[in-house]
């Protein structure tokens, strides 16, 4: 059976959907190429501005957050003690080794406790990574994840399911461009009165995340194992 890697990119969207705004170069060349060559579409998530863990919960379990209390985070409530059906459990039943991977603190949203209740054999968080590079506001860059995925794939003989959560695109986005930071992409024709610096900073972060996706696809294509990347 093929390896399966599910990649959840932090605060990621296609900026070409923002009308009238122009960019000095293509922001997401790798994602656009992949979208044209393979199945692609849009996903609606249950949160905005915060709540990554609730997106994770819906994606992994298929359970709607509307079934919970207003503002509830299952990671902080029921999953502290309960086991929940998930894609990881389904794949374990098919013989997969199951892994969660996140380049941020393992205790954030109690992931270090919760992932075992969602069927994962291992959870690798930033505490177990080395040679980490950080962006100007202190979040780990996603480029480190390619090597971490490689380590997981090398750690088992059989098929692996790796649920990967990135963090580079996380806010808060600065209202002034950080000192000594020279963004590769410039934003033009932006909305009057809006926070152009914050948007330009964000655009450059997702551009780097797109580069990471390209590097990951290249690595997986050169590896002598079938792999599905979602």
Predicted regions and their residues:
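Solvent-exposed soluble domains appended to multi-pass membrane proteins
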Residues: 6-9, 13-230
């Amino acid at each position: 059976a093929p390896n399966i890697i599910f990649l959840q990119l932090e605060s990621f969207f296609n900026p070409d959907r923002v009308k009238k705004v122009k960019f000095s170069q293509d922001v997401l060349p790798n994602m656009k190429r992949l979208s044209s060559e393979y199945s692609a579409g849009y996903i609606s998530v249950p949160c905005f501005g915060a709540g990554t863990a609730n997106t994770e919960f819906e994606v992994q379990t298929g359970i709607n957050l509307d079934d919970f209390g207003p503002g509830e985070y299952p990671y902080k409530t029921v999953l502290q003690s309960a086991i929940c059906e998930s894609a990881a459990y389904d794949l374990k039943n098919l013989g997969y080794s199951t892994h969660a991977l996140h380049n941020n603190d393992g205790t954030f949203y109690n992931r270090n406790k919760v992932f075992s209740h969602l069927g994962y054999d291992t959870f690798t968080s930033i505490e177990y990574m080395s040679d980490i590079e950080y962006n100007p506001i202190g979040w780990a860059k996603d480029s480190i994840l390619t090597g971490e995925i490689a380590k997981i794939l090398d750690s088992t003989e059989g098929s692996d399911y790796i649920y990967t959560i990135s963090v580079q695109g996380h806010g808060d986005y600065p209202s002034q461009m950080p000192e000594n930071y020279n963004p590769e992409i410039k934003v033009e024709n932006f909305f009057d009165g809006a926070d152009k610096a914050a948007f330009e900073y964000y655009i450059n972060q997702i551009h780097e995340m797109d580069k990471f996706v390209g590097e990951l696809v290249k690595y997986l294509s050169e590896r002598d194992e079938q792999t599905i990347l979602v």
